[in-house]
Amino acid sequence: RHFFSSESEADGWRHLATERAAADPLEATVSVDQHDVAIIMYTSGTTGLPKGAMLTHGNLLWNNINASLAFGSSRDDVILTVAPLFHIGGLNVMTLGSFHTGSTLVLLRNFDPVQVLADLERYKVTHMFGAPAMFLFMSQQPQFADTDLSSIKNLICGAAPVPESLIELYGTRGVDFCQGYGLTETSPFSAFLTPEWAVSKLGSAGQPPLYSDTRIVDADNRPLPPGERGEICLRGPNIMKGYWNRPDATAEAIDKEGWFHSGDVGYLDEDGFLFICDRLKDMVISGGENVYPAEVEGVLYKHDAIAEVAVVGMPDEKWGEAVTAVVALHEGQDLTLEDLREWAGPFLAKYKLPLRLHVVDALPRNPAGKVLKFVLKEQLGE
């Protein structure tokens, strides 16, 4: 292991500037092919250890071609990037997309919901990408009601399923969501829901972009018809080359026909719109019934007392797994399991209702805003 300092020398550390000055100069020109690896972007690690996805120059280019066609991007846009650049959404959804079209880029160091609201108004931002949690926290600020959002064409939302209540809330401010679905391994976008479909296809992640294919398969990798739930598989020039130093994981993720197996559960409707149900690994099996946490979370988010919610499955002697709701409450609010079950009863089948409730100050999240459910399970297990 090597430690480098860029500011001053320290005992046992190597000085980066000194070594760089002594190094042989790079070749003036380097030949680059679209199949060459451009970056190694690590997955978010929400279900375990992150893996390094090798993304090529072609992957990045085709992602931005797909995004530009979907968003109708132009050089007149003002793009705000607040998602971290080590996250594929922060780097390749908006930032490289802005370079691609030559638009104005507002680049923030970190996410502060009050600062973001101020900058949306100050710079007359037209597009912003964020995780649902970011837009949720923004909406919870007192400044939200008075912020001028009239310049916004689209808020692009990804990284997790978007609660319908959040879509409806921003709709009251005249702001449209362009929901997207994708993964680090897909550079990332693999589906778009543009504003004209926001009402009629509410809850959908959209359609595959022009240069990408999507299909749903069963456990035996057989394609499923519209309306049936299965694993979402993706193919196109935006799919990664493989995982860095993980040929085993690459072979497991990308089949011989070039389909990337996402590990996400979803279905396509009759019109080819993709609906995301949940991660396969997050699915709870309670009493032999499959429960998709995202569905339960979407309902619970509508409860007036709940600020944040995550649903996980915890071991249970009777049911195998117990549907467990972990919530952070709005200030001054109280909530009991009995009250929550009674409130949610009209909206969820009985087997989907939480059997346990844990109230916390905040949910554990990674820097991209995704809830770390494996951390939650570890904490609850302790």
Please provide the spans of the model-predicted regions.
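AMP-binding/adenylate-forming core of the ANL superfamily
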Residues: 215, 226-240, 259, 265-266
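Gly/Ser/Thr-rich phosphate-binding loop
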Residues: 117, 122-130, 139-200, 213, ...
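Conserved S/T- and glycine-rich ATP-binding loop of Class I adenylate-forming
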Residues: 37, 43-46, 79, 85, ...
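Conserved pre-ATP/AMP-binding loop-to-beta segment of ANL
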Residues: 10-11, 23-42, 49, 72-78
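Conserved AMP-binding/adenylation subdomain of ANL enzymes
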Residues: 61-78, 86-127, 141
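AMP-binding/adenylate-forming catalytic core of the ANL superfamily
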Residues: 128, 220, 236, 241-242, ...
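Conserved AMP-binding A3 loop
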Residues: 38-62
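Structural core segment of the AMP-binding/adenylate-forming
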Residues: 1-21, 27-32, 331-333, 358
